A protein has these predicted regions:
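Terminal transmembrane helical module of multi-pass membrane proteins
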Residues: 124-159
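Transmembrane helix-loop junctions in multipass membrane proteins, especially transporters and channels
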Residues: 28, 50-62, 90-94, 124-129, ...
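N-terminal juxtamembrane cytosolic/stromal segments of multi-pass membrane proteins
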Residues: 1-49, 53
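Alpha-helical transmembrane segments with an aromatic anchor "belt"
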Residues: 58-123
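Structural signature of transmembrane alpha-helix termini at the membrane-water interface
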Residues: 44-55, 117-125, 147-154
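Short alpha-helical transmembrane interface motifs in multi-pass membrane proteins
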Residues: 3, 68-73, 130-137
Length: 159
């Protein structure tokens, strides 16, 4: 078992998901402040992706920007996931609390957020023929976050 700062626990969970989420559970660590900050960064990443993606790769360019759909797609969907996961875990004898599900789920989104920012930067540098790199980075972030989410839910509910 390790002694980490709250940010250290986040890095430990992202880079060592099997061990990290189990250690997080047994040490009763995890910061609600950091998880809310991650959800805020998720919203910011979606806004940046929508507005700042290079014009060659941006299919959603509009003159009027509406933030409400992005709030729904990031913050509302996240809390719907947390609440739904908690409701199902109570029916299936999971051990996760609402707070732990929120923390673990937010920690799992970090690779997606980071890869979204990297893809936006690359979209402003690369040409259309090199779009495979942007797609690969996006799929890497999604896949890594899905793996982390599965491991996190397995650890938090003890399935």
């Amino acid at each position: 078992m390790y002694e980490f700062t709250p940010v250290g626990w986040l890095k430990h969970c992202v880079f060592h998901p099997v061990e990290g989420f189990e250690d997080l559970r047994w040490k009763k660590q995890g910061s609600m402040k950091i998880s809310m900050l991650i959800v805020l960064f998720l919203f910011i990443a979606m806004v940046v992706d929508r507005q700042l993606t290079g014009f060659q790769f941006n299919d959603s360019y509009v003159k009027v920007f509406n933030v409400v759909p992005l709030i729904v797609q990031s913050v509302v969907y996240f809390f719907t996931w947390v609440l739904g996961n908690w409701a199902i875990c109570t029916l299936l004898d999971g051990e996760g609390t609402l707070k732990k599900i929120c923390i673990y789920s937010a920690y799992s989104l970090v690779p997606y957020i980071v890869c979204t920012f990297i893809a936006v930067i690359f979209s402003n540098v690369l040409v259309q023929d090199e779009s495979i790199w942007i797609t690969a980075i996006q799929y890497l972030g999604i896949g890594w976050s899905v793996i982390l989410m599965v491991r996190a839910m397995r650890a938090v509910h003890q399935y």
